[in-house]
Regions:
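Solvent-exposed, low-complexity segments and loops of surface/extracellular structural proteins
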Residues: 1-194
Length: 194
């Protein structure tokens, strides 16, 4: 994050750490790119190659679109403070949410077996669960979920505004701590194995 102080007002303003002009290549090995978004309504589409892990912290409701990314294996949204942000074009990546108390949106998941990791998400309060939308525009193509949860209070949904998601028929959950995972109504109707 870039922190700038306005000389006229003395106000601090943070700016996004990535934009659509960025071209990054991680090369060999396992690489992690950490992104902070600060401007609401921003849609950044960076070109990423050989970067396996993408971590995003939303300070405002914006979109990081990975349509020009290759080799991404895990997308993690963590420690966000602003309105629900969206990570689009996640393809076959594992989707992870950590230390999060605001909603998260993903889009464009093509994984048939979707790995979901939730660590210290939401709270036990009556309205403490956060919503994780697995397909804001294009529904998730997962036919099964593999969920790892630790102290997670999550409501899963798929808005699927343009393209319907696949029919999910099974889910596995490995849980530690206290958890509450609520599936989307459409998934509850079709999951046969839990």
């Amino acid at each position: 994050t870039k922190l700038i102080v306005d000389p006229a007002s003395g106000t601090k303003k943070t700016f996004d750490t990535i934009d659509s002009l960025d071209i990054l290549d991680g090369g060999k090995g396992t690489d992690t790119l950490s992104i902070v978004t600060a401007d609401a309504g921003t849609n950044a589409t960076p070109t990423l190659t050989n970067i396996e892990n993408v971590n995003v912290k939303f300070q405002a409701g914006s979109t990081i679109d990975l349509v020009n990314a290759t080799g991404v294996e895990t997308v993690k949204v963590h420690n966000s403070t602003g309105a629900a942000g969206t990570v689009a074009s996640v393809a076959g990546a594992t989707l992870s949410v950590a230390n999060q108390k605001v909603d998260v949106n993903f889009d464009g998941s093509t994984a048939e077996k979707l790995n979901l990791n939730f660590d210290t998400v939401g709270t036990a309060a009556a309205a403490g669960s956060i919503t994780v939308d697995l397909g804001v525009i294009d529904g998730s193509q997962a036919t099964s979920f593999n969920i790892i949860a630790k102290d997670a209070y999550v409501t899963l949904k798929e808005t699927a505004g343009t393209t319907a998601g696949a029919t999910t028929t099974s889910a596995t959950i490995a849980a530690t701590g206290t958890n509450k995972i609520q599936f989307a109504t459409s998934d509850l109707a079709t999951i046969e194995t839990l």
